[in-house]
A protein has these predicted regions:
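A short loop-to-beta-strand structural motif that recurs across blades of beta-propeller domains
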Residues: 27-31, 97-101, 158-162
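Sequence signature of WD/YWTD-type beta-propeller architectures
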Residues: 5-8, 14-20, 32-34, 41-45, ...
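Residue-level detector of Asp-centered blade-edge/turn motifs that repeat once per structural unit
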Residues: 9-16, 83-86, 143-147
Length: 166
């Protein structure tokens, strides 16, 4: 069994070896410290233990939409991830037709997933501010360094959308 996967390194000082992996078909985002991979386990390293450490976000195969603490949040086919310079992770949540955000500088127990852009599950095409814009299966997201401009690859609408965040 496989999954579409998308990866990005953390931009946070002191976390240069932390890699985030979005697993679309498993509806999760994992966190892996690549400095812990040794030559002996390079072919089998799965990250930290499954008991809440390797899995950074989302319930195992628990697809859906739910904002909130990392342990409770749900995704539906999260795809591309990217970061602002201050550690906010933007996620193209394709199946929910919205963009999600995690502040990765927060301790894992207090960090939360939010949906600042799009209307979860309300696919379509609508311009407007982040709270009214509609997308249809966005697969890509890019953000400028301070998080004020977000570009979204609105896949099923076949357009690149640009949003200004204030």
């Amino acid at each position: 069994a496989g999954s579409d996967s998308y990866i990005a390194f953390s931009p946070i000082k002191g976390e240069e070896n932390v890699l985030y992996v979005s697993l679309a078909d498993f509806h999760q985002i994992w966190r892996v410290d690549v400095s812990k991979i040794t030559p002996e386990d390079k072919d089998t390293y799965n990250g930290e233990s499954y008991a809440g450490k390797a899995i950074y976000e989302g319930v195992m195969n628990g697809k859906g939409w739910e904002d909130g603490l990392l342990k409770n949040a749900k995704f539906r086919h999260p795809r591309q991830i990217c970061f602002t310079d201050d550690g906010k992770m933007y996620i193209a949540d394709s199946g929910n037709s919205c963009i999600r955000v995690i502040d990765t500088t927060m301790p894992k127990e207090r960090a939360a997933v939010t949906t600042p852009i799009g209307l979860p599950g309300a696919e379509g095409y609508k311009d407007g501010g982040p709270e009214i814009a509609k997308f249809h299966f966005p697969c890509g997201v890019a953000v400028n360094s301070d998080g004020t401009i977000v570009y979204v690859a609105d896949t099923q609408n076949k357009v690149i959308r640009k949003l200004s965040i204030e």
